[in-house]
Amino acid sequence: MAITLREQYLEGFVSSHEMDCMAPQVAAAVRQLRQHTGAGSDFHGWLTLPRDYDKEELARIHAAAEKIREDTDVLVVIGIGGSYLGARSAIELLRSPYYNALGKDGPAIYFAGCNLSGSYLDEILALCEGKRVSLNVISKSGTTTEPALAFRVLRGMMERRYGKEAAGRIYCTTDRARGTLKSLADREGWQTFVIPDDVGGRYSVLTAVGLLPMAVAGIDIDAVLAGAEKAMTELDNDDFSHNPCYRYAAIRNILLRRGKAIEIYASYEPRFTQMGEWLKQLYGESEGKDGKGLFPASVAFTTDLHSMGQFIQDGSRNLFETVIDFITPAADLTVEEDPENLDGLNFLSGMAMRQINRRAMQGTILAHTRGGVPNLVLEVPAINEEEYGYMVYFFMLACGISGYLLGVNPFDQPGVEAYKKNMFALLGKPGYEDLRQELLAKLGE
């Protein structure tokens, strides 16, 4: 169990001298994390979470998940950003993108509160019709607009359907002691789980935020935490030349300084697609501030080779690719021979799909690097709970280091307030009257 960083496709883009120069800078960034001297140090709790996770809380998560699996046909997870992306990515990677159709050993799991679309929420309600439903609402404050609105609608549905018994089907993942959702849960008798004070949303996948939905999906969350703890131990290694996480953070920084402002996360495994969304939030929200940062994007190959492949090969040379390579797929098929061979593919007969997929990956990496796009490859041995936990910790650690290398606070997100103020003003929220008039004038209303 480990992630291997392949650097051979960086030749001509990143020099050994540059890497040597980055070593002391990375060491300084790591000290800011480990010694809690960097900006945002009050949100460093995720660093030791895999080892120090509250065992009583973990037991309650297991018990609640088992109850939900026994008495529920549909679990609706209500949250946005880090409050849902981690769980969704884990379920799709470790179970299947088709989990709700194939997961016959547990309830279907749908995600709400991640947008403001009325039609989306109406369809969630339709999926709940005639089914035994439970809710898992995730919010530290309980007042974030999207999940709060979705919870208002879904809570109403639950109370009309179950009456007082609805309380036994609502699970809240929220602050330990304060906030609107915590107060409401205490009043109504809903079971609660804790989002630690020192863990921010996008770093919270290894808390109840991610672990409860994962456990309901039948994922071994003890193995997830064990994999993350192994990463925590192995990556606490000051030998820069042999630490793939530190080297990954350094390479990203070098490429940014060379004008490669876009990082594309690429995988040849469709199960990884939602993980790409999680990475986009993790890195985009952590690094994108003070006029700095790499812009994170994601592609699903080979699908996107038939759309974005043209741009990556021949477009602006301001990007690089980070390829996540799963050595052993979750399942595989072998190509059969066709006597007619009308498609001309009999030369592939007897080959496993993973072999074909790997050759496609290798050919693409060679083509893109020749076209001026640096590629770094992160090899993950297999798709299982331990490797997932290891991978999640790897990326979070690299993100914290990368933020400090940039000179930004990787644990805040001040930029998200601008659109919220405008939205609240336009919706007529009390206290925003002057801004509302200003914005309506700009909109010509």
Language model: regions and residue ranges:
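C-terminal helical cap and adjacent loop that interface with cofactors, partners, or active-site loops
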Residues: 364-427
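Glycine-rich phosphate-binding loops that contact phosphosugars or nucleotide phosphates
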Residues: 66-238
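Short glycine-rich or small-residue beta-strand-to-loop segments that form or flank ligand, phosphate
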Residues: 48-50, 74-81, 134-141, 261-269, ...
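Active-site phosphate/pyrophosphate-binding segments
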Residues: 161-321, 327, 413-445
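Helicase-primase coupling helices
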Residues: 297-383
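Glycine-rich phosphate/diphosphate-binding loops that line cofactor/substrate pockets in enzymes
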Residues: 60-73, 124-133, 251-261, 312-317
